[in-house]
């Protein structure tokens, strides 16, 4: 398009052919916060009951959260308080605009080492946003069963559930496939089980979970299978 991409700092990535992002100015940051707010307002006007602020998967909010992708020295960078300011200001602005009767969920990735997102910072981040007016927290774990190499055997779900208030429901997502996986995640402290891949191949997946032996077909899916998905 010829438009230079923007980010928290000047960054590049494999596949960008040497193109670097432009570090956002103070004006651009505040304008983007307003853009998130305007999007939430449109959702409310359209009849939705809430929005999820996507701070995971290396998208823009996530780029502000990472130590590697956010190397700013102003108030939008530095420690986790500074690096989370973009997200917290979005939460504050959206809540002010949509009122108390509209749900706000926040989604984060607990660990993305390439971006400089580490578990300790993510736990601190959750403590910060749990004190704000959010209604749900969504942790996108890539794999909810993964172990963290820190001598602590507790799952990511259990660690986050331990530090967030019981009044805030926890959604946990990543590599859940069958009913046993879902039950394990609930037992670890998730209030809601999030899925992606299995839901694409089996959109009626939740209706089969009552069967503890349910084993949905795994990828790769055939063209015929996907063509017949409701």
Put a short name on every predicted segment.
Residues 1-230:
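Flavin-dependent oxidoreductase catalytic cores
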């Amino acid at each position: 398009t010829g438009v230079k991409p923007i980010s928290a700092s000047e960054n590049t990535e494999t596949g960008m052919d040497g193109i670097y992002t432009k570090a956002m100015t103070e004006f651009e940051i505040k304008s983007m916060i307003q853009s998130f707010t305007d999007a939430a307002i449109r959702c409310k006007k359209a009849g939705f009951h809430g929005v999820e602020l996507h701070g995971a998967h290396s998208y823009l909010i996530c780029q502000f959260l990472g130590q590697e992708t956010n190397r700013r020295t102003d108030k939008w960078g530095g420690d986790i308080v500074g690096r989370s300011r973009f997200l917290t200001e979005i939460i504050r602005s959206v809540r002010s605009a949509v009122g108390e009767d509209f749900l706000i969920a926040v989604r984060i990735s607990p660990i993305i080492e390439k971006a400089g997102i580490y578990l300790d910072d993510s736990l601190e981040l959750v403590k910060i946003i749990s004190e704000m007016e959010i209604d749900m927290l969504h942790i996108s774990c890539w794999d909810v069963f993964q172990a963290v190499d820190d001598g602590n055997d507790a799952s990511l779900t259990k660690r986050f559930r331990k530090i967030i208030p019981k009044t805030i429901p926890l959604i946990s997502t990543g590599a859940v496939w069958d009913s046993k996986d879902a039950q394990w995640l609930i037992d670890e402290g998730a209030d809601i089980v999030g899925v992606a891949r299995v839901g694409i191949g089996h959109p009626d997946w939740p209706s089969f979970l009552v069967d503890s032996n349910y084993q949905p077909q795994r990828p790769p899916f055939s063209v015929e299978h996907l063509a017949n998905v409701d």
